[in-house]
UniProtKB/Swiss-Prot annotation:
Its main location: nucleus. One of its GO terms (biological process) is nuclear RNA surveillance. PANTHER family: ZINC FINGER CCCH DOMAIN-CONTAINING PROTEI (PTHR13119), ZINC FINGER CCCH DOMAIN-CONTAINING PROTEIN 4 (PTHR13119:SF23). The gene is Zc3h4. RNA-binding protein that suppresses transcription of long non-coding RNAs (lncRNAs). LncRNAs are defined as transcripts more than 200 nucleotides that are not translated into protein. Together with WDR82, part of a transcription termination checkpoint that promotes transcription termination of lncRNAs and their subsequent degradation by the exosome. The transcription termination checkpoint is activated by the inefficiently spliced first exon of lncRNAs. Residues 1-33, 506-529, 538-556, 603-622, 669-683, 994-1005 have a biased composition (Pro residues). It comes from Mus musculus (Mouse). Residues 165-174, 824-852, 1028-1044, 1058-1067, 1204-1220 have a biased composition (Polar residues). This is Zinc finger CCCH domain-containing protein 4. Residues 252-264 have a biased composition (Gly residues). The modification Asymmetric dimethylarginine is found at R599. Residues 913-929, 1098-1129, 1137-1146, 1225-1235 have a biased composition (Low complexity). Keywords: Chromosome, Coiled coil, Metal-binding, Methylation, Phosphoprotein, Repeat, RNA-binding, Transcription, Transcription regulation, Transcription termination, Zinc, Zinc-finger. It holds the Pfam family zf-CCCH. Interacts with WDR82.
């Protein structure tokens, strides 16, 4: 700002521009001339015009400077003369200006002398600076300025204005901005300035340049020079001003002229638009001066920059900024910078040439025109600039990584910038927009996997460097490893703290495991990513996070499919549909894969694999337990084998390709559980679809568990199932080894091992999404445990009631064997409730741990034994088996068939074990395995179906598990606002506003009243009318879920009602769904009995989730769990797509699509079964949601009151249980919930504990539409008691963010 004083403010009258100068004028205080007057706009104008004059003078000075101080010396006089002449000319402009100019000239002369000295000094300095010493004589700066004086002026204008502009605009610019500033300002600022110049300074230029331009310029120059001199003398010594002044001080004026001038209040003021620029310039100059101190950077850079800027400016001038630019700049910055520059140039060259005219010439010169000095300077400058451009001057901004000019930059970018020793966080995600220009490390970052294990699964395709470690890379690798270790330690601490609090967080996913599927290319994740590489879904990814950046991509890079390459099926499956979070197979990153893969290959590998290793290590056990729990856990721990449901079996399989996929196999989890049928399990559907998507295994996980357990019990998943193992056939053997231990362990600790937490928790754990942070997960598990306990108690209570009516669902008997695994409660339930047993078997199948959860489902489904089977079949089997069935056969029918089959099969026993599976498997897989008739066969088939459904199934389970965890909350919420809350929940996520009304329309109360009939109908219809059944199952399931959620008393009542109504409900269910209004009234009526009403409502809400589950069950695709996926895929994209579509549709029901459902009316039931399938749940979702949800609600509510609760509860329970019981289900369940709305799905995954509830709700919402609600209803049962109380609603609100909208 010193410059400000430097420029005497000419009377504004001096030139018309004064008005424009105000801006400069404002800066003018800084531009005060040495006289002490604030540079008035006039002065600024002068400055602007001065650029011409100055340019002339400056050119001379600049020339001198450029040429060396020599010319500067000559020009000083010449410039002075020119300036004087100009001054005289400008004299007319204003006396004051003239005096100022004269003073300035004197000062300038003195300054020029000083500057020459300074320049000489600088020259030596500059000479030190390669760039400076180049063409521009010593003073690269000065020279730069000189030759590029104009350019420089521009540069300065640019740069100071630019910088100033930046500085003006952002005042931190000074030196730093310069480069960029220069460049940018050059173009931008300059443009602005140009305009500014042209506008404000333009006038100044015009008037001042013409009038004042020359004389004033001289005077101004003199004054500025004097000012500068004073300034320089005072502080920087113009020359010493460093580049700023010295630079600017190309001549005496250089100082004033250059920035000096700019600096000189005028130059700068003018140069910059107004004072700020000047100030900025001053600042800049000061900085530059300091730059002198900074010389290396300042002078050198400045010189370089000056050169480049000068060149740039010159080119620009040449381009057209031309005079105005040169001058404009000159005027503007010109007077300040421009002047300094312009003048420097003009002055330098100009002076040599002839002063003022030269100034103009200089402009021309700059533009390419030029007079002697100008020309010379131009010559000098141009070559200089070009040389600079060509690499003489390194772009300082480029060095700083902020040059925006790119290839157009006038400065050299020919330097190899050292990369920041840090992995580019964008690169690891698979795309860095800066590509090779990125200052962070990309492919040159060391591959952690490769350098730590010596074997990178990505091989040559690895994103990271496999080159021998250098000191630098070793340091980076060590740092990364240290960070990983630190992160791991932190996680351990967190886990310890949680454990102290009594919370058993789910195991974290292996370092390489993540929620997101591993992208194919980023996969070459650097070893670092391996930890992150396979960021698991679970919160576990956090540990990997440190390396995540590298790992993240690597992990991601490991395409989930890639791992599936061997598992083309899974890959295909994935390709066919958009995987949901739960469905996503997270493949360990290359490193992880290597670690896991390396181990994976061996039986031990599966256990050993990092993810599986830890979890899998116990994989068998853990795997088994993890199965359900593992869903999430699997992601984290079983992660590797996750994919493989087949974890154990697949392990071998996995290692080969699953291995990376393993993570994928949340669903695959079941694979391991299939332990006995381990290989079969793997084959079960996952084998085929298994990998087809970890997910398929996931759904199977539910069924799978059932199958698995039943298998263990005797089914052993029959090799037939193993047939699915075809894919794993070779693995079967391998799995035998790892699988055996895994399987046995699995069976041993299926529940406890869920790794979700305590054995009891497994279900909850299973429900817990892996992506949840450990704390949340622990919380979630805890909640789930409580819910499970409650549900178990309920189931036990209900078991007796349901037992009577469960006989209807003898099919549940086959579940009993599954149930054995389900848990003690399952056993008691089996004894007490066959239906419950059935549902529980589902839970068992889902996982023993989910037995508790399963029990709730069972309880829910228990009311109606047959329904229970249906719901179960619809739900668990449907989800898993149906998915499979659908996958196998056409799921559209499969879905509906599943429910019916579920009934018929359960009845016939074909799918006895798989209540849902019977329908689905019967149609697709259930039927294929004739043995299925036997409970074990059914289980096996279930297992088989599971593979197809795995992804959906598991997600369903997970969601259910989550639901179970939040079942109490859900119930409350459901009770409070079954349909509306449900809608609300989805509304935010899925924009289910329409569904809300429709769901509301079919109020749960009405549903409860009619539901008893409807539910029974649904259940019965299911057996009688496969289509209806399918639809019914959806409805029934939702109802069942709802019923399960409702109080046991209600359930018993409902059961009675159901028994009475079951026969006639087959057709009505569809209609009732369609006719939600009656349902609503009924539901409302039931509302009278708070318990019934609330139960009904909760049921609907929960039923909705269960419905989704049943839907999923109905639709074998089991995409329901991944409804989002299904929705995205337009169906599961599995064979069970149709069935799943229904399910998904059901889930979709709550999806925004739900609102779409035009067929919400009568289609609900239908939609649930078949119609929705086509739409993939969109239409179905809409139709079902609108109507079916109401109906479902009815069903759900009714079921809670009626036996429907039993059947649907079973389904719901299945789903719910699956959700609770199998961790995979947890994943699946969230998926199911999320499947309805992808957002939901996503939400569940992000915050399992929270999401699960919302998921349940979300699921519930769709459930009403489809049978999905039932499963959730199943979940509701746990909350049944709570449902009655509005408090649950509050609880839910408190519990889940989504819940509050839902509650509302």
């Amino acid at each position: 700002m010193e410059a400000v004083p430097g420029t005497p403010p000419p009377p504004p009258s001096e030139s018309p521009p004064p008005p424009s100068p105000p801006p400069p004028s404002t800066p003018s205080p800084p531009p005060c001339s040495p006289d002490g007057r604030a540079a008035t706009p006039h002065l600024l104008h002068h400055r602007l015009p001065l650029p011409d004059d100055r340019e002339d003078g400056e050119l001379e000075e600049g020339e001198l400077e450029d040429d060396g101080a020599e010319e500067v010396q000559d020009p000083p006089g010449g410039q002075e003369r020119s300036r004087k002449e100009k001054g005289e000319k400008h004299h007319s402009d204003s006396e004051e200006e003239k005096s100022h100019r004269r003073l300035k000239r004197k000062r300038k002369k003195e300054r020029e002398k000083e500057k020459r000295r300074s320049k000489k000094r600088r020259k030596s300095k500059h000479k030190r600076h390669a760039s400076s010493s180049d063409d521009f004589s010593d003073f690269s700066d000065d020279s730069d300025f000189s030759p590029s004086e104009k350019s420089h002026r521009k540069y300065r204008d640019y740069s100071p204005p630019y910088a100033p502009s930046h500085q003006q605009y952002s005042s931190s610019h000074n030196a730093p901005l310069p480069k960029k500033s220069y460049s940018k300002m050059d173009s931008k600022g300059y443009s602005m300035y140009e305009d500014y110049e042209n506008e404000q300074y333009g006038e100044y230029e015009g008037d001042e340049e013409e009038d004042m331009g020359k004389e004033d310029y001289d005077d101004f120059t003199k004054e500025l020079n004097q000012y500068r001199r004073a300034k320089e003398g005072s502080s920087r010594g113009r020359g010493s001003r460093g580049r700023g002044r010295g630079y600017r001080g190309r001549g005496s004026r250089g100082g004033s002229r250059g920035r000096g001038m700019g600096r000189g209040s005028r130059g700068r003021g003018r140069g910059s638009m107004g004072e700020h620029p000047e100030d900025e310039e001053d600042l800049y100059e000061e900085e530059i001066e300091y730059g002198e101190s900074e010389e290396p950077m300042g002078d050198d850079d400045y010189d370089d920059y000056s050169k480049e800027l000068n060149q740039y400016r010159r080119s620009k001038d040449s381009r057209g900024r031309g005079l105005s630019r040169g001058r404009g700049r000159g005027s503007r910055g010109g007077r300040g910078k421009g002047m300094g520059r312009g003048r420097g140039r003009g002055g330098r060259g100009g002076m040599s040439k002839g002063g003022m005219n030269d100034d103009e010439d200089f402009y021309d010169d700059d533009m390419g025109d030029g007079g002697g000095g100008s020309y010379r300077r131009s010559d000098h400058d141009k070559p200089h600039q070009q040389s600079d451009k060509k690499g003489k001057v390194i772009c300082k901004y480029f060095v700083e990584g902020r040059c925006t000019w790119g290839d157009h930059c006038n400065f050299s970018h020919d330097i190899e910038l050292p990369k920041k020793r840090e992995l580019c966080k964008f690169y690891i995600t698979g795309f860095c927009a800066r590509a090779e220009n990125c200052p962070y490390m990309h492919g040159d970052f060391p591959c952690k996997l490769y350098h730590t294990t010596g074997n990178c699964i990505n091989g040559d395709d690895c994103m990271f460097s496999h080159d021998p470690l250098t000191e630098e890379t070793r340091e980076l690798l060590d740092k990364m490893l240290a960070d990983d270790a630190e992160a791991g330690a932190e996680d351990e601490k967190e886990v310890e703290e949680l454990k102290k609090q009594g919370i058993n967080p789910l195991p974290k996913p292996p370092p390489g495991v993540g929620l997101l599927p591993t992208p194919p290319r980023p996969p070459g994740p650097p070893a670092p990513t391996s930890p992150n590489g396979r960021p698991m879904q679970g919160g576990p990814p956090p540990p990997p996070p440190p390396p995540p950046p590298p790992p993240g991509p690597p992990q991601m890079s490991l395409p989930t499919h890639e791992p599936l390459s061997p598992q083309q099926l899974q890959q295909d499956m994935y390709n066919k549909k958009i995987p949901s979070l739960f469905e996503i197979v997270v493949r360990p990153t290359g490193q992880l894969a290597e670690k896991l893969g390396v181990r994976f290959p061996g039986p031990g590998g599966p256990s050993g694999p990092m993810g599986p290793g830890p979890n899998m290590g116990p994989p068998g056990p853990m795997g088994g337990p993890m199965h359900p729990d593992m869903h999430p856990d699997m992601h984290p721990d079983m992660h590797p084998d996750m994919h493989p449901d087949m974890h154990p079996d697949m392990h071998p399989d996995m290692h080969p390709d699953m291995h990376p996929d393993m993570p994928m196999g949340p669903g695959m989890n079941p694979g391991p559980p299939m332990g006995p049928g381990g290989p079969p399990m793997m084959p079960y559907g996952p084998g085929d679809s298994p990998h087809s998507g970890m997910m398929p295994p996931i759904p199977p996980a539910q069924n799978f568990y059932e199958n698995f357990y039943p298998q263990q019990e005797g089914m052993e998943m029959e090799p037939g199932l193993v047939g699915d193992a075809e894919d794993y056939g070779h693995y079967e053997e391998l799995p035998g080894q790892p699988g055996e231990p895994l399987f046995p362990e699995h069976p041993l600790e299926p529940d406890s091992f869920p790794e979700g937490g305590p054995p009891g928790r497994p279900k909850a754990g299973a429900g817990v999404p892996d992506f949840l942070p450990s704390a949340q997960r622990a919380l979630y598990l805890r909640i789930q445990q409580k819910q499970q306990e409650e549900e178990r108690a309920r189931r036990l209570a209900e078991s007796s009631k349901q037992d009577r009516e469960n006989e209807e669902g003898d099919t549940g008997n086959w579940y009993s064997s599954d149930e054995d695994e389900g848990g003690s409660s399952v056993t008691s339930i089996l004894k007490t409730l066959r239906q419950q047993t059935s549902s529980r078997p589902q839970a068992s199948v889902g996982e023993p741990s989910s037995s508790g959860l399963g029990d709730p489902r069972l309880q829910k489904g228990h009311p109606t034994g047959s329904r229970l089977s249906d719901p179960r079949l619809s739900r668990d089997p449907r989800l898993s088996r149906h998915a499979e069935t659908s996958g196998g056969s056409g799921p559209g029918d499969s879905g509906p068939s599943d429910p019916r089959l579920a009934r018929a099969l359960p009845t016939s026993k074909a799918e006895g074990s798989l209540h849902s599976s019977p329908a689905g498997p019967s149609s697709s897989k259930g039927q294929p395995p004739a043995e299925e008739e036997e409970g074990e066969r059914a289980l096996r088939e279930k297992a088989v179906n599971i593979p197809l459904d795995p992804l959906p199934g598991h997600p369903l389970r997970d969601p259910r598990s989550q639901l179970q965890q939040f079942s109490h909350i859900k119930k409350d919420v459901t009770l409070s606002k079954p349909s509306f809350a449900r809608t609300v929940l989805w509304n935010p996520e899925d924009l289910i506003p329409l569904p809300i009304p429709k769901q509301d329309v079919p109020p749960v109360p009405a549903a409860l009243q009619s539901l008893p009939a409807l539910d029974p109908r649904l259940h019965r219809s299911t057996p009688p009318g496969p289509p209806n059944t399918r639809q019914r199952p959806g409805s029934t399931d939702p109802s069942t879920s709802g019923s399960n959620l409702p109080d046991f008393e209600l359930l018993s009542r409902i059961l009675k009602t159901v028994n009475v109504n079951t026969p006639g409900q087959s057709e009505k269910p569809s209609d009732p769904r369609v006719r939600k209004t009656p349902t609503d009234p009924r539901l409302q009526k039931p509302a009278d009995p708070v318990a019934a009403s609330r139960a009904a409502k909760p049921c609907p809400t929960e039923a909705s989730p269960p419905a989704a589950s049943p839907s999923g069950d109905s639709s074998p695709p089991a995409t329901a769990p991944y409804d989002p996926r299904v929705l995205a895929a337009g169906g599961l994209g599995q064979g069970s797509s149709s069935g799943q579509s229904s399910v998904l549709s059901g889930i979709s029901l709550y999806d925004p699509r739900t609102p779409n459902a035009g067929g919400k009316t009568a289609e609900p039931a239908s939609d649930t079964s078949a119609q929705p399938k086509g739409p993939e749940g969109n239409g179905k979702g809409s139709a079902s949601k609108a109507k079916e949800p109401p109906f479902v609600r009815k069903s759900a509510l009714e079921q809670p009151e009626t036996g429907k609760a039993s059947t649907d509860g079973a389904t719901a329970t299945d789903r719910y249980n699956s959700y609770n019981r199998p961790r995979p289900k947890a994943t699946a369940a969230p998926t199911a919930a999320s499947s309805t709305p992808p957002p939901e799905g996503a939400t569940p995954q992000p915050g399992v504990h929270n999401l699960p509830v919302p998921t349940l709700f979300g699921t519930v919402k769709p459930a009403p539409k489809t049978g999905t609600g039932s499963p959730f209803a199943g979940n509701s049962p746990a909350r049944e008691g709570e449902q009655d109380a509005g408090s649950l609603k509050d609880v839910f609100k408190g519990f889940d963010p989504t819940a509050s909208p839902f509650c509302q």
